Structures are given as structure tokens and as C-alpha cells.
């Protein structure tokens, strides 16, 4: 009897969460023009599907005005590319008191380890004020997956510096990267990552290639590939791609936005990506 009651209680809890989630979606979307009363009646029992048909173009949201929880909600409902645009930005505060700006660089681009699509990819507009080496020694052995920078970003930096509301909605995604100068690719599952040469420039230049696809933001005409630190100083920045011709360096982007490379033990700027 107790087990039956427990099962029923569990089912009721799931139903309450579903109803609350649907209610939140409807209340949020009603002012945007995406959902009206008829749509609600027709689709309330669907799996959060909203059929737009030939409805007028809805109002887009200003990313800066949305909480990370709201952004995550739109992403979870598959509405991210309807509510926001590539290039939209949102500032957030790190635990050290400094600020970074996150920019949407692509929709429906990255995948979770279970193969499901993760709908929004962000990259920080600025590099961190403090430069970081890719590795403590001058080697690219093991590639991004085995690097010091990857461990730092996904460990202490993620846990200690990012705001709790942002950490709560970041979804780990699979990133492919060459293991070293050879053609072997390995996958890593990352909460935070730096882009590959191909994700920035759309092709391999001095990397091994096949390390992800070109992000929409970087496809656009007149997009500046160069970046500045949080303090405004022009900065080099790391890419996660090992140099295809040696065992000591990784690819980077110089202050002018051109493809370059640096010894793995050199400290360079870090502009990181994440997905929601």
C-alpha cells in the first residue's frame, strides 16, 4: 500500500511540474504574439509545441533584459532562434567583481553527449584580463582534451567565478579536436570551451581540420575577429586546435583577428564559449 501511495505521489508531483512549466510558457509567450487563446487550447496537451503557421512575425526579446532562467526556458522550448538573434549580447558579473559580455554566435549548432541538440551557443565578447597558458609545458600532446586550460575553465573557473544563475543553465556539449599534430580526433564534453580554428575561420589553416563547423556570427561580413580584454586592451586569444605541423603549439587569433599560433606554455587571452 505504501509503495502504491508513493508512486501516486510521484506521478502527481510530475503532473504539477508539467502544468507549472506549461503555465509559465504560456504566460511568458502571450505578450510576444506567439501564443493566443486558440493556440493554447489547441496545443496545451502537446509536448510544448506551438504551431505558428502563417501568423505575423512575433516580437523578439531583448536578450539583455532576460534572466538566464528565461533564456534557458526559450531554448528548452526550441524557441531561441525565434526570440533572439545571432549577435545579441548579455552582460554578467564574475565573482571577482568584473564583467563579461556573452554574445550569441549560433543557434542549433552544438550537441549534448546524448545526441540531443543544444539550441544556443554563446561566446564572450572580451577575453579575460588575466592571460592563461594552454599547458604548463610546451606541448600539445593530448590536444584540448588533456590541456591545462580546459581543466581550469571547466573546474575552478566554472565553479568559483561564474554566477550561480548562469551555471545552473549551462549545458555541456561535445567538442571535437585533434589529439596533437596528427589527424586523430578526440571528443570532450565541456561546459566551457574555446573555439577551434575552423569554428572561427570556417576552414583549417594550420590546424588538422574537422574540429567543428563555422559559427554563424563569424560567417557574417565585417565581423571583427580580433578581441580586447575586459580592460579594453587588444589581446591575442587561444583556439583549442593543436598546430598541425608540430608538437609544441596551439592555434590562436592575433590582436588584428588573423590566424596565428603560439607555444602551448605561453600565456594568451581566453574568450570562452558555452551553450544553453
For each feature predicted by the language model, list its residue ranges.
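Intrinsically disordered, low-complexity segments enriched in polar/charged small residues
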Residues: 12, 27-28, 245, 256
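Long, heptad-repeat coiled-coil alpha-helices used as oligomerization/scaffolding rods
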Residues: 8, 12-15, 19-22, 29, ...
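Intrinsically disordered, low-complexity regions of eukaryotic proteins
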Residues: 18, 38-40, 256
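Helical coiled-coil/dimerization "stalks"
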Residues: 27-47
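Collagenous Gly-X-Y triple-helix signature in extracellular proteins
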Residues: 42-276
Amino acid at each position: 500500500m505504501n509503495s502504491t501511495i508513493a508512486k501516486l505521489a510521484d506521478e502527481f508531483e510530475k503532473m504539477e511540474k508539467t502544468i507549472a512549466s506549461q503555465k509559465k510558457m504560456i504566460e511568458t509567450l502571450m505578450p510576444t504574439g506567439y501564443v493566443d487563446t486558440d493556440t493554447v487550447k489547441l496545443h496545451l496537451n502537446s509536448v510544448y509545441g506551438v504551431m505558428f503557421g502563417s501568423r505575423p512575425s512575433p516580437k523578439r526579446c531583448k536578450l539583455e533584459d532576460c534572466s538566464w532562467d528565461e533564456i534557458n526556458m526559450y531554448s528548452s522550448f526550441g524557441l531561441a532562434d525565434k526570440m533572439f538573434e545571432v549577435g545579441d549580447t548579455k552582460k554578467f558579473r564574475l565573482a571577482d567583481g568584473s564583467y563579461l559580455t556573452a554574445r550569441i554566435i549560433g543557434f542549433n549548432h552544438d550537441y549534448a553527449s546524448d545526441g540531443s541538440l543544444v539550441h544556443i551557443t554563446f561566446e564572450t565578447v572580451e577575453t579575460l584580463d588575466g592571460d592563461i597558458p594552454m599547458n604548463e609545458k610546451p606541448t600539445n600532446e593530448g590536444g584540448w582534451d588533456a590541456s591545462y586550460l580546459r581543466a581550469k575553465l571547466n573546474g575552478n573557473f566554472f565553479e568559483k567565478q561564474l554566477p550561480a544563475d548562469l551555471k545552473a543553465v549551462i549545458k555541456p556539449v561535445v567538442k571535437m579536436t585533434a589529439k596533437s599534430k596528427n589527424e586523430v580526433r578526440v571528443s570532450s564534453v565541456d561546459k566551457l570551451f574555446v573555439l577551434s580554428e575552423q569554428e572561427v575561420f570556417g576552414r583549417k589553416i594550420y590546424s588538422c581540420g574537422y574540429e567543428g563547423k563555422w559559427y554563424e556570427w563569424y560567417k557574417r561580413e565585417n565581423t571583427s575577429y580580433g578581441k580586447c580584454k575586459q580592460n579594453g586592451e587588444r589581446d591575442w586569444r587561444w583556439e583549442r586546435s593543436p598546430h598541425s605541423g608540430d608538437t609544441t603549439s596551439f592555434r590562436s587569433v592575433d590582436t588584428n583577428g588573423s590566424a596565428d599560433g603560439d607555444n602551448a606554455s605561453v600565456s594568451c587571452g581566453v574568450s570562452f564559449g558555452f551553450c544553453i
